[in-house]
Amino acid sequence: FRSNLDQRIRDLRKAEHEHPCRNCPDLQQHLKWGHRWARETRELQRVTDRYDSRTGSVARQFDCICDILTGLGYLERHVNAAGHIDMTLTEKGLLLRRIYSEHDLELCEALLAGTFDKLDANGLAAVLSSLVYEARRGGDGEPRHYPGGISGPIAIASSKLKGICEDIDILCEDHGLDEMQRPDFGILDIMYEWADGGSLGSCLYGTDMTGGDFVRTAKRLADVLQQIAVAQPLPFDGGERLAGLAHEAADRVNRGVVAYSGVD
């Protein structure tokens, strides 16, 4: 075995010595450039891999979000003089910029679609509570009952809001993004009673919700309502009325223990 290995080594050395490249007068220069090419190729691959990694995460998500916002009419793309693509906010985009919520896009779509037009202040607070409430325990995301019945304006507005959220989830899925958190209507009837002037004890009676969880949700809801109230001018018919309604709803929610509490 050793003799065969030695013979193979001798043969390889002979072949290397007799290789045509040995007669090239620029052999050393070619070797120098060959090593440089290999080094630059490795560096290019490293940079390419890093770019692909970034594109596959934050940058890719950003591009997908911009595509969704453009498709929904919140952004417009323009090609500038240098041939680069610039994006500008539309009138709808300016509204979205003034709303700060995990469900800001769903909320803007609902506002622009007139989802809340038939609601009073109590109903608006009740329906919008679904966008800020996060249940600690598993549930079906439905209230014990819909004030006004299943054919009333609150139930109808809730159904429309669910549909809007489902449509946006489909868009996210089509673009390879994670689904948005679904709205949870489990606190709807409780929040309605609170906005209607009920005491904390009577509103929570018969539920497993703690006072702290309710107050936390109510403060977040009041913040969203106040954002709508001051986001004028709202770019749709009835926007001024809805802004006033949101202001009234915020006052109805942010009262008593909710107003006094420092819970965020």
Predicted regions and their residues:
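Non-catalytic terminal extensions of ATP-dependent helicases
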Residues: 1-264
